[in-house]
From Swiss-Prot:
This is Apyrase. It holds the Pfam family Metallophos. The lineage of its organism: Eukaryota, Metazoa, Ecdysozoa, Arthropoda, Hexapoda. It comes from the Eukaryota. Facilitates hematophagy by inhibiting ADP-dependent platelet aggregation in the host. Cleaves adenosine triphosphate (ATP) and adenosine diphosphate (ADP) to adenosine monophosphate (AMP) and inorganic phosphate. May reduce probing time by facilitating the speed of locating blood.
Length: 564
């Protein structure tokens, strides 16, 4: 850019303007600490619990005897009760921002039942849904919603469009609620990431634009004489900043989720895990288009922190001061004895089912590298899918998106728990017939960055993909070679015929065109198979031991090297 000051200034202007709305904040209290003439509202909040019912280690994985155990639902419950009591005089309410489903064997085996048991014990003032609440379709969500309703817990998603979904037609999801605390009426609006229907198994359900929905619902609440409006969002830190900027004329604060963002102000000098990356201050203050200051909070994930923010409002309903921080749920936090007792029967079920041996492996089945390149877990999983449909005269390819995987499998015995936790989303192992040109488009899309700046590298069986990441978007797939679907005895590879049709085994999630894999919708035929975990389990039982895998199925060319 040397010699082009005009361009430099323009780029600097763009950078500054993109951050101008965000104020990096810490506690904002008057020097004399006198807030006696202001109305206090305290928000106690958690998000993205992801089935961490049992205590965890510092990395939010299962805690072992060697670890320092933290978090867990018994500690979270105790901390919430303590905060509700401590801040009762400051009008405390407790909010849950969604994604309580998915993430451990507890959910994989016990689904909505165990989740409902503990969420109803915590009993938030209100909660919204996360995208993972749809992991087992609306049918898997409906009984959970019914239990929340029985417990008197309102579920709020203002931008949820039912589209006559048969499983949710009797659910009592609301756009917003009004609660009265300290003589003031508080409106709470729930909102879910508006592309959830593209990344989750939502059935007929879709999501409307989050910003426009919040604007509309907030205006209606203001017209109804609500004093303060809280947005309970499962949209991500970045999306929440957008909501604050563009819909900030009527809302007062956003309690967020989805991005697992750790917001913290070091000036608070409060304890935290110093290995947790700080993404912004707690609270983050965004200036709206009409110059109002909108605080945003989020409490990372996995029950590792419980957020507590106290806001002070003037008579005009404007936030004048605030203070608070995420409370670290370390091992100094006591565990509630009643919750500990309630965990015992559930834990017994998890241990009994999860510890059964299925097979063994002499190599680590890696998950961490799956997003960027071929990984051993992905290769084994793809082989299992292909094997399920293979017979003496037929063998399909198999492709699995990297986002399908959640946990690696370590060297040693492979258990039921390992099988389920490796890919816990409950997809079916389907078979489709797809044109070669569409398969090429799918391979190209796997290299595109998602909203978290990640690729979704395909894990494959029966084909070989060569990728040149130095090329432009849309031209990164150099070649695809494939085996013959009709000759399972031959492992010879031939160039993909982009006009021919091929048979491909894949997860139903991918076959549905989720995660932007829209070319999958061009399939000319589709057959629904059994649960993916059952297919994976059967394959591991069949081969008994994983001791070697044929790799180099996805070749990522290195800079300066031939790409063939």
């Amino acid at each position: 850019m040397a010699g082009k000051p005009g361009i430099q200034l323009f780029v600097i202007f763009l950078l500054l303007s993109s951050f101008a709305a965000v104020v990096w904040a810490m506690d904002n209290m008057p020097a004399d600490k006198d807030v006696s003439k202001l109305f206090p509202l305290t928000l106690i909040h958690i998000n993205d619990l992801h089935a961490r019912f049992d205590e965890t280690n510092m990395k939010s994985n299962a805690c072992t005897a060697k670890d320092q155990c933290i978090a867990g639902i018994a500690r979270v419950y105790q901390k919430i009760q303590d905060l509700l009591k401590e801040y009762k005089s400051k009008n405390a309410i407790y909010l849950n921002a969604g994604d309580n489903f998915q993430g451990t064997l507890w959910y994989n085996l016990l689904r909505w039942q165990v989740t409902a048991d503990f969420i109803t014990k915590l009993k938030p003032t209100a909660m919204t849904l996360g995208n993972h609440e749809f992991d087992h379709t609306p049918k898997g969500l409906a009984p959970y919603l019914a239990e929340l309703d029985k417990a008197g817990i309102p579920t709020l998603v203002a931008n949820l469009v039912m589209n006559d979904d048969p499983d949710l037609k009797s659910s009592k999801i609301q756009k917003s609620i009004k609660v009265t605390v300290g003589g003031k009426t508080i409106g709470i609006i729930g909102v879910l990431y508006d592309k959830t229907h593209e990344i989750a198994q939502t059935g007929k359900v879709t999501l409307s634009n989050a910003v426009e929905t919040v604007k509309r619902e907030a205006a209606a609440l203001k017209k109804d004489k609500v004093d303060i409006i809280v947005v309970l969002s499962h949209c991500s830190y970045d999306e929440d900043k957008k909501i604050a900027k563009e819909a900030g004329q009527d809302i007062d604060v956003i309690v967020g989720a989805h991005s697992h963002s750790f917001l913290y102000s070091k000036e608070s000098n409060k304890p935290y895990d110093q290995k947790d990356k700080i993404e912004g201050p707690y609270p983050t203050i965004v200036e709206s288009n009409n110059k109002r200051k909108i605080p945003i909070v989020q409490a990372k994930s996995f029950g590792k922190y419980v957020g507590r923010l106290t806001l002070y409002f003037d008579n005009e309903g404007e936030v004048k001061h605030w203070e608070g921080y995420p409370e670290f749920i370390d091992n100094k936090v006591k565990q509630d004895p009643k919750i500990l007792e309630a965990l015992i029967p559930w834990r017994k079920k998890v241990q009994e089912i999860g510890s059964t041996k299925v097979g063994e492996t002499t190599i680590e089945l890696d998950r961490d590298s799956c997003r960027d390149k071929e990984c051993t877990l992905g290769v084994l999983y793809a082989d299992a899918f292909a094997d399920h449909y293979t017979n003496s005269s037929f063998r399909p390819f198999a492709i699995i998106q990297a986002g399908n995987f959640r946990n690696p499998i370590k060297v040693g015995k492979i258990t039921n728990g390992d099988i389920i936790e490796a890919a816990p989303f409950g997809s079916t192992a389907d078979l489709i017939r797809l044109k070669g040109d569409n398969l090429w488009a799918v391979a190209e899309h796997s290299l595109a960055l998602d909203d978290e700046n990640r690729t979704n590298c395909l894990q494959v069986s029966g084909l070989r993909i060569v990728i040149d990441p130095s090329k432009s978007v849309g031209s990164r797939v150099v070649k695809i070679d494939v085996m013959d679907n009709r000759n399972p005895k031959s492992e010879d590879l031939k160039p993909l015929d982009r006009n021919a049709e091929y048979f491909i085994a894949l997860p139903s999630y991918l076959a549905d065109g989720k995660d932007g894999f829209s070319a999958m919708k061009e399939a000319t035929a589709r057959w629904t198979g059994p649960l993916d975990s059952d297919v994976f389990k059967s394959y591991v039982e069949k081969i008994k031991k994983v001791d070697k895998l044929k790799l180099d199925r996805v070749i990522v060319c290195k800079a300066g090297s031939p790409c063939t």
